[in-house]
Every structure is written in structure tokens, then in C-alpha cells.
Regions:
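Globin-like tetrapyrrole-binding proteins
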Residues: 1-142
Length: 142
């Protein structure tokens, strides 16, 4: 099974769970970055959108989708409105999402799933870093 198929299987398993991935993800994120909580004016809406977008980006990367790069670049640009967001925070969010997937799936989480999700997470983090560097060149932060 290729990475995209493995990830699709993961998402199918996730959909069968009575748990929303976003709750644990945001508990983790706000525990590590408590100052960021204030930036979320409506966390119930924002957490759904950001979790779904990140899952879509990771899955899109696995499938070689061309829309991923423009969306990443746009998301990084729009996040500049929230002030200085260090690359480490983006990286931590992506890593936490994969960790939360593993936690939610428990015994159904396989080595193949871990490999697929971690590989795409690394690719996404690299892409976010590239987008941030390009935006900093044309629209410096601060």
C-alpha cells in the first residue's frame, strides 16, 4: 500500500472513532504554547478548520497533489496577521497532530501508518518553512 492509501485507511479508522482528533490536539498545543490560546477567538470553529486543513495537506502531499503548495503559502501568509509565529510552533502543531492520531487509533496504529504520516509531516514542515522564508523576503515580520 502506498503512503496515500495508508493515510486514507488511517482516516477511515479515525472516522469510526467517537472522538474528535482536534480536542486532544489542541489540549497538547495549548499546553505547550499557552500564550497562543488568546489568538483563538472562536476555538470551536478554528480548531475544526485547522485540524481538517492539516490532515488534508498531509494527505494531499502523499498523493502528490499540486494544490498543496499554494494552500500552504496562503495559510502561512494569513497567519502573519497573528504576529510572529516561529517555525517551531508550526512544526510542533504538525507533529502533535500525528502524535494525536496515534493516540486516538491506539492498537490500530501500525508501523506503516507511522512511516507514512511522519514522512508527510516532515515534507509539510519543510514546505511551511519554505513558505515562511519566501513571505519574510517580501513581507518581513515585525
Amino acid at each position: 500500500m502506498n503512503a496515500a492509501a495508508t493515510m486514507e485507511h488511517t482516516l477511515t479508522l479515525l472516522a469510526e472513532r467517537p472522538i474528535e482528533l482536534r480536542h486532544g490536539l489542541y489540549e497538547r498545543f495549548f499546553a505547550e504554547f499557552p500564550a497562543r490560546r488568546a489568538a483563538f477567538l472562536c476555538p470551536e470553529a478554528t480548531s475544526v478548520r485547522m485540524t481538517d486543513e492539516t490532515l488534508q495537506l498531509l494527505y494531499g502531499l502523499a498523493g502528490g497533489e499540486k494544490w498543496v503548495w499554494p494552500l500552504v503559502a496562503e495559510l502561512v501568509a494569513t497567519h502573519q496577521a497573528y504576529g510572529d509565529l516561529p517555525l517551531g510552533e508550526y512544526d510542533a502543531f504538525v507533529d502533535m497532530l500525528v502524535e494525536e492520531l496515534e493516540a486516538v487509533l491506539g492498537i490500530d496504529w501500525t508501523e506503516d501508518q507511522a512511516d507514512a504520516w511522519h514522512e508527510q509531516a516532515e515534507a509539510l514542515k519543510t514546505m511551511i518553512g519554505k513558505a515562511q522564508a519566501e513571505w519574510d523576503h517580501v513581507l518581513p515580520r515585525g
